């Protein structure tokens, strides 16, 4: 919860105002802590003075919608407390089920809250079903939509919600999170995680947990070398491992994207165009990667080619 003082002030000011808006969009890049904020804010919203409050997961007036496990095997992993793969979207059936639960009044007080984590992952039918509830909210019900890319939401949904924006954290705040959550990190990994975080402590933690320091070093080398003999691209395939899961693949793409973003801040006009084109290619790759089962070697070769394309030509280097 580091670095969100402005968001808390806006939220608590709205609560104190007596006319709390029923729909809220928590907008900002992934990994800033929006979902954690939503849980804490929702619990604060529904709490009644003098009424004991159950733990969040057991609270009858707090609902969290997120993509379900991908299959029965992943359900078992979830139930066993293990990491599990989810479906790509929140389904319309999930939204409708919540709608049925909201037909009654809140249980412990006058308010209840529904957290959608995240609004970017709603099926088309689910968006329409949610929109109906936003247009005619059930009594005492408040919606908090965690959204990584605001432009993906329909304008009709955005127009019915207050937008609470979350901004990237400073390098110092990201480092505070890293030191608190992973104090065992060596200095090289800490520096690499900070370099690709882009103000997102979640991105820094994912990078460190996945052990992608070697990848980031190769990424940086590729931005300075056209890699004519493909040696660096070959090294990428070995660095990510033989069978990386989807989370590791996505973390690798995001680390490459943020390596380009960081280079953009130091580039001259001539280099900037190549970097922008490489960035666009990485964004497109991130969009299709969850849908297609990429061979890890092919994926890393494509990432490496995009980075190498942004490196200076021999003529440009002169």
What do the predicted segments below correspond to?
Residues 1-53, 139-141, 148-318:
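Charged, glycine-rich active-site and insertion segments that engage polyanionic ligands
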Residues 109-113, 138-144:
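Loop/turn-to-beta-strand initiation segments
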Residues 121-122, 136, 152:
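Residues immediately C-terminal
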């Amino acid at each position: 919860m580091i670095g969100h003082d402005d968001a808390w002030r806006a939220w608590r000011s709205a609560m104190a105002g007596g006319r709390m808006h029923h729909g809220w969009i928590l907008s900002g890049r992934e990994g800033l802590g929006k979902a954690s904020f939503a849980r804490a804010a929702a619990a604060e919203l529904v709490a009644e003075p003098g009424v004991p409050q159950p733990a969040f997961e057991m609270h009858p007036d707090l609902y969290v919608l997120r993509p379900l496990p991908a299959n029965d095997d992943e359900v078992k992993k979830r139930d066993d407390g293990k990491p599990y793969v989810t479906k790509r979207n929140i389904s319309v059936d999930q939204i409708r089920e919540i709608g049925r639960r909201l037909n009654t009044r809140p249980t412990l007080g006058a308010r209840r809250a529904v957290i959608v984590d995240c609004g970017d992952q709603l099926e088309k039918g689910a968006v329409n079903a949610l929109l109906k509830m936003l247009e005619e909210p059930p009594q005492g019900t408040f919606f908090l939509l965690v959204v990584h890319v605001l432009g993906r939401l329909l304008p009709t949904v955005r127009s019915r919600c207050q937008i609470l924006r979350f901004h990237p954290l400073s390098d110092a705040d990201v480092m505070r999170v890293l030191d608190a959550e992973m104090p065992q990190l060596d200095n090289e990994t800490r520096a690499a995680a900070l370099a690709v975080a882009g103000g997102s402590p979640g991105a820094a933690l994912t990078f460190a947990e996945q052990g992608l320091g070697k990848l980031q070093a190769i990424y940086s080398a590729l931005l300075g070398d056209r890699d004519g003999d493909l040696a660096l691209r070959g090294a990428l395939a070995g660095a990510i491992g033989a069978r990386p899961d989807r989370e590791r693949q996505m973390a690798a793409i995001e680390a490459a994207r943020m390596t380009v973003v960081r280079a953009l801040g130091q580039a001259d006009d001539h280099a900037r165009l190549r970097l922008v084109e490489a960035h666009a290619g990485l964004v497109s790759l991130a969009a299709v990667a969850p849908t297609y089962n990429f061979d890890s070697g092919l994926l890393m070769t494509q990432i490496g080619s995009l980075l190498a394309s942004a490196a200076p030509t021999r003529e440009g280097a002169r």
